[in-house]
Curated annotation (Swiss-Prot):
Keyword check for Chaperone: no
Subunit structure comment from the entry: Heterotrimer; disulfide-linked and containing an alpha/SCNN1A, a beta/SCNN1B and a gamma/SCNN1G subunit.
Record keywords, A-Z: Cell membrane, Cell projection, Cilium, Cytoplasm, Cytoplasmic vesicle, Disulfide bond, Flagellum, Ion channel, Ion transport, Membrane, Sodium, Sodium channel, Sodium transport, Transmembrane, Transmembrane helix, Transport
Principal subcellular localization: membrane
Species lineage: Eukaryota, Metazoa, Chordata, Craniata, Vertebrata
Protein name: Epithelial sodium channel subunit alpha
Family: Belongs to the amiloride-sensitive sodium channel (TC 1.A.6) family. SCNN1A subfamily.
A biological process term (GO) from this entry: sodium ion transmembrane transport
Basic residues bias spans: 178-197
Protein source organism: Pelodiscus sinensis (Chinese softshell turtle)
Amino acid sequence: MHQVVTVKAEKVPMGKRLRRCKQEAENQQKVEEVAEKLEKEHEGLIEFHKSYHELFQFFCNNTTIHGAIRLVCSKRNKMKTAFWSVLFFLTFGLMYWQFGILYREYFSFPVNLNLNLNSDKLTFPAVTLCTLNPYRYSAVRKELDELDRITHQTLMDLYNYSMSQVQSNGAAQSSQKRSQRSLSHHVQRHPLRRRKRNEPVSLKGNSPPVDKSDWKIGFILCNETNEDCFHQTYSSGVDAVREWYSFHYINILARMPDTKALDESNFESFIYACRFNEVTCDKANYTHFHHPLYGNCYTFNDRNNSLWTSSLPGINNGLSLLVRTEQNDYIPLLSTVTGARVMVHEQNEPAFMDDGGFNVRPGIETSISMRKETTMLLGGSYSDCTEDGSDVPVQNLYSSRYTEQVCIRSCFQIHMVKRCGCAYYFYPLPPGAEYCDYTKHIAWGYCYYKLQVEFKSNILGCFSKCRKPCEVTKYQLSAGYSHWPSAVSENWVFHILSQQNKYNITSKRNGVAKVNIFFEEWKYKTNGESPAFTVVTLLSQLGNQWSLWFGSSVLSVVELAELILDFIAITIILSFKRFRSRQVPAPSVPPPGAHDNTAFQSEPADPSAPHRFTVEAVVTTLPSYNSLEPCRRDGEAVIGLE
């Protein structure tokens, strides 16, 4: 059955068509505005690219790094793309190799050495002069009597030498008996013995090869249980006797309640004359201290409130001293050197006479010229120096400013107290400690000499812990010698000195010595350090390398950093999306037998049932062909089909 539908075309008027076009344009504009508004509403604070390809495509199209744009522009030519890719990454690697060299140089903290010559008034250094005799022998003879007898007997046994050439047999026998009693109590643990060994010995360090036949004398040191002993040996018998005598002399001093009363601190009895810059010195210009071996010591120009200054060089513009060097009352077995000992050092620094001093000969005028030299080091990462010693893990036992020697000696004394239970007499006493005395500390000598071996080989770590100061001032000394006074003038010179000091100089030339200390020149040298590779230099070198290889700026570095951050962010986002997709459950599927239920079976078709269907036709009016004509836009009209 067919039904024919007749459609009647109706022509749309022109005005209606224009209105319709205008309405469609307005609707299109509204749709675009709504879409733009929705896009702005959905725009976030931080937007990332959707893929790696999009990220690198955007970077290569917009970066200011030279060569990166070629990776995109040459993508249709695979050979060029490969060439520029290899060249780009090779250049990148070379640039960062240069960066590594620059960073390594920067973190090595190199320095430049600066040498300056300064011309100014020079502050005169402190000068310490010692008598080389710790005590007057007449004042300590009673305390040293037992030690002297033991030493005399030892010299007789070893070298057949008697200190007293005229001695009765009874006195000798009595002395020998007393010595034997003393040896059994004190010295038998540390006896002097002659030893001769023919086998060679190898010494550690830089010591020259020594045959053991040269090691002739020494003394034994044992621990408290006498289970461990060793020989403290010397190649010279004089050195061995003096060291052994000094060891027991220290024990005697430690037992004495007060040794200050024995000090001969009379300035005039040692210093006959003192002048600085042609002006006489007075008591306000020196300080006094006592050394157990070097005796009474006088330090000139150590008062910080009134320091001497020198404007001109020369012998007449320095310090001139006339000192007494007679040995009428010296300890014979301890004071083996005649003269005086002098040392030049900075103010507020202890005078370590055995390290930096030298001896002045009697009957000689010693002229010492000085040249000042200051070294200033950079601290922090540039060198292992310290400003004031506050960052050094060693307690300063001296009442002075920090020096390397102060730290080293304090370190040894602290280890001495910890290891041996007592302090060494030559160094300051730590709080709560007492000086070593073998009546209380039987094996302190064994402990001390064992500790000395560890100290010198840096097993204690004192040389590693004690760092050098960042500013050090040293004086380069040059000495000249001449006989004083001359043979034709010595009579009247010594006569005047005897009348002036009320002391009869009997030995004349061997009784006095003259010392002149002055600046050789009024210029002094300063050695300084400055950083050779600063942060500014590093940034400049990095910029030069970046410009050389890529011709870019700091903003290009920011672009590269942005690329790295975007790459990391995209990696995290994609990984998170992949993880979420694995967590979403799959859609449910009906069971395989769901349609087996008889209730869901379709009805069988009845062949006798008639076929019925309904056809609905929707008849609309066909548009006019004039409606296909485009609307006017921008003042133009396009004519369509009629």
